[in-house]
Every structure is written in structure tokens, then in C-alpha cells.
A protein has these predicted regions:
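Subset of outer-membrane beta-barrel
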Residues: 1-182
Length: 182
């Protein structure tokens, strides 16, 4: 997922509720326009702090299409924020994810029909969990997260070719500069 800068909660559950107000986000991205099977990403998320508590919650949905594959992911996030100083807050978050991966073999042109490598590849469901930490103020933010702790095999155990989604660590940071006093 390359659009994390626009929707940090997708990769870091500690971001949920960190803005202090309800936030709704939507994104559509199409690459290689006009090319059949070109990558397309759609994402929508909502997150909010829970009033009179240190908790934040979020829900996100991501749909990605690449060639003959479609992947739908829905995630629920919860975060807990601690005021560490007058300026900084530190948030911890956990994420629960449900993922549905589908390969449409009718969009492929195999050399021979009945290839065993192309069997049992549709509607592969996989759950996952993740966690993150997010330090933020009005000017500075730093974060670290692992959105998916479990390695996910995309094809059945009998296949020779297996695609695995491995655990990734994400680090994010930034500072807001004032360009002028006006």
C-alpha cells in the first residue's frame, strides 16, 4: 500500500482518533490508464476519538485490483493516547483485519487447460492483526507499526507456486514548517 501518506491509519492503528476530531478519508488511484488489468486502488476510512476518554477508533476498507487479482481488506482499529507533555501525545494502537483475495483464472491465458497451479486460487480469506505507536504534536509526528503480524499464503498448500505476504515494518515521520509569519 503506497498511499499511506494520505491515510496513515491503514498502516498504523495508533493514528485512529489522533486528530482529535472525526476524520473521513477517500481515495481512488488508477495507474497505467488505458491498459487492461492496470492497478487500481480504492480506499475509504473513518476514525474518531471517543469523547471523554483516551480512546480512538477507526474502520477502513481497501480494494485493490491488479491484472486478474482482486483484494478486499476491511480493518478495525482502536488506539489509546497518553498526554506525555504539554506539547506531545503518545498513542498505541491495535488492528484487526479481514482480507479476501481472489484470482480470476478466466482472465489468464494458460498454455494448457487444467493446470493444477491454477486450481483453488479464488476467494482466499485470511485474518490478521497488527499494532503501532504514534508520537505527535501540532508540528511533529513519528510512528512505527506492523499492520500484519502473520505471514499469509495466498495459494493453497498443494501448489508449487506460492505468494506470501510477509510481515512489514513501517516507519513514518514529519515536521510542519512555517514558511512565513503570515
Amino acid at each position: 500500500y503506497t498511499q499511506y501518506m494520505y491515510n496513515t491509519m491503514v498502516i498504523n492503528p495508533a493514528y485512529a482518533g489522533s486528530r482529535g476530531v472525526m476524520s473521513i478519508f477517500g481515495l481512488h488511484r488508477t495507474q497505467w490508464v488505458g491498459l487492461d488489468g492496470a492497478p487500481t486502488t480504492n480506499a475509504i476510512s473513518i476514525n474518531t476519538p471517543i469523547e471523554n476518554s483516551n480512546l480512538g477508533v477507526g474502520l477502513s476498507f481497501v480494494n485493490e485490483k491488479v491484472g486478474p487479482t482482486v483484494e478486499n481488506t476491511i480493518s478495525a482499529d482502536i488506539s489509546y493516547t497518553i498526554q506525555t507533555s504539554e506539547t506531545y501525545k503518545l498513542s498505541f494502537g491495535v488492528k484487526g483485519t479481514a482480507n479476501l483475495f481472489n484470482l480470476d483464472v478466466t482472465k489468464l491465458n494458460p498454455v494448457s487447460t487444467g493446470d493444477p497451479l491454477l486450481q483453488n486460487l479464488d476467494n482466499n480469506f485470511s485474518p490478521n492483526v497488527g499494532a503501532g505507536v504514534y508520537l505527535h504534536s501540532n508540528k511533529l509526528y513519528l510512528g512505527a507499526s506492523v499492520p500484519n503480524f502473520f505471514e499469509t499464503k495466498r495459494y493453497d498448500d498443494n501448489s508449487i507456486a506460492v505468494y506470501k505476504e510477509r510481515m512489514n515494518m513501517y516507519f513514518i515521520g514529519g515536521y510542519v514548517f512555517d514558511l512565513s509569519s503570515n
